[in-house]
Amino acid sequence: MIDEIIEDAQDRMGKSIEALKTSLTKIRTGRAHASLLDNIVVEYYGMDTPLNQVGNVSVPDARNLSITVFDKSMISAVEKAIMKSDLGLNPQSNGTLIRIPLPPLTEERRKDLVKVVRGEAEGGKVAIRNIRRDANSDFKSLLKEKEISEDDHHQAEDSIQKITDVFVKQVDEVLVKKEAELMEI
């Protein structure tokens, strides 16, 4: 019973870390990466379609992205979708290929992004602590129903706290890595 609760909490904490990493990849650093455009949707024959289904995104170098659109008539729609996204990118088309130069981030913009990243990381920590709280309340209800002893209850709370500490440390490591990426010129 206790092991199931702990295992479930570990799974949920792992998913929280993955969700944090996913949300941080959407924050633009000075480097080009294809996942930067993952959330962009293009109107394709009346339907909203993810950009990666309309064209192929590649990274020719650290400061540029390029998109090869499968249907050449969609180039202007793809450009509009990129401009509408609030990434601050200006696509340039040569008829068959869309190039997106990534302007270097200003110092002020970097600091703003670091604040955003810290907020995301704090949200990840809060999610992990909420999972710990849920597990602890499950342990308390088991104790009230006399399904576990007082000693088992304390051991379970200690082990869930140790697991929580490990995951919070992982959040801190992800945060430090992303901050370093942002402050790199």
From Swiss-Prot:
One of its GO terms (molecular function) is ribosomal large subunit binding. One of its GO terms (cellular component) is cytosol. The keyword Cytoplasm applies. Its main location: cytoplasm. It is found in: Cytoplasm. Keywords: Cytoplasm, Protein biosynthesis. It holds the Pfam family RRF. InterPro entries: Ribosome_recyc_fac, Ribosome_recyc_fac_dom, RRF_sf. Coiled coil: none annotated. One of its GO terms (biological process) is cytoplasmic translational termination. The keyword Cytoplasm applies. Responsible for the release of ribosomes from messenger RNA at the termination of protein biosynthesis. May increase the efficiency of translation by recycling ribosomes from one round of translation to another. Belongs to the RRF family. NCBIfam families: frr (TIGR00496). This is Ribosome-recycling factor. It comes from Colwellia psychrerythraea (strain 34H / ATCC BAA-681) (Vibrio psychroerythus).
